[in-house]
Design a protein with these regions (language model features):
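Jelly-roll (double-stranded beta-helix
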Residues: 1-257
């Protein structure tokens, strides 16, 4: 298993609404400076912040499956399907853009914080489907706790969110002195963003490597293996993991660096 750790300097950045919304982008759009341009069907990952409030006006989407996952504050959504919704901390909004939809969004703080993540299904097939939108509150997501680790399943498995693209997503909190182990099978990639605190990651039997808050970790597996994440210090660790296939059996959108 191969491990790569990318600090914020190797991630992209962006802003909206005159700087009211700022973004750190582990996987950005073309030209936004991220060292990682895509990971299989994981096309885009932005970590947005708004100290007070920020607005992004109506704009179109097609084909992609777009998840908004709220860390803090509130996310407002409106679209051309006639939908209006608000989601708070721990909640999520999912757009499956299909043949096309327009939407607008607002982040409301103080200190609003969320992820927007794009997954790429087979675009040709997706364009034949009607667009859909769904919202989920924090209490709808299952959590399991064991030996100082809390794992919330956001996409896949027991979660209410299932998408067409092959992907799983988890929000993991690790107490000081505890560790979380994630198994990876061949042709699988794990993308990890350290949301709160730092820690150590070891891939299989390799020596553990340290990472800091806001670092982006990428692990690729060519055979069965496991990655271990341990908290460092006295404040614990929170990170979000997304697992996708390293390669898919359909053509992907040609994304430039």
């Amino acid at each position: 298993m191969k491990l790569r750790i990318l600090p914020p300097a190797e991630q992209g950045s962006g802003e909206f609404d005159g700087g009211a919304i700022t973004e750190q982008k582990p996987i950005g759009f073309s030209g936004e400076g991220s060292a990682i341009h895509r990971l299989g069907p994981l096309f885009y990952w932005a970590w947005a912040h708004a100290e007070a409030e920020g607005f992004i006006g109506s704009h179109p989407h097609q084909a992609f499956e777009i998840l908004t996952y709220v860390i803090h504050g509130q996310a407002y959504h409106g679209d051309s399907l006639g939908t209006e919704s608000i989601v708070g901390p721990g909640g999520a909004q999912l757009i499956q853009a299909g043949s096309g939809v327009y939407h607008q969004e607002r982040l409301v703080g103080p200190d609003a914080e969320l992820f927007q993540i794009w997954f790429e299904p087979n675009i040709r097939d997706a364009l034949r489907r009607d667009p859909q939108y769904a919202a989920y509150e924090a209490h709808e997501f299952p959590e399991r706790e064991q030996e100082g680790v809390t794992v919330k399943t956001v996409i896949g498995g027991p979660s209410p969110i299932h998408i067409v693209a092959d992907a799983g997503m988890w929000d993991v909190s690790v107490s000081p002195g505890a560790s979380y182990v994630h198994a990876l099978h061949p042709n699988r990639t794990l993308a990890v963003l350290a949301v709160r605190g730092g820690g150590e990651c070891s891939a299989d039997d390799a020596e553990a490597q340290s990472f800091a808050e806001k670092d982006f970790l990428v692990l690729r597996s060519e055979e069965d293996g496991q990655a271990r994440f341990a908290a460092r210090g006295t404040n614990g660790l929170r990170f979000v993991l997304i697992e996708v296939p390293t390669e898919v059996d359909y053509p992907l959108y040609p994304k430039k660096p």
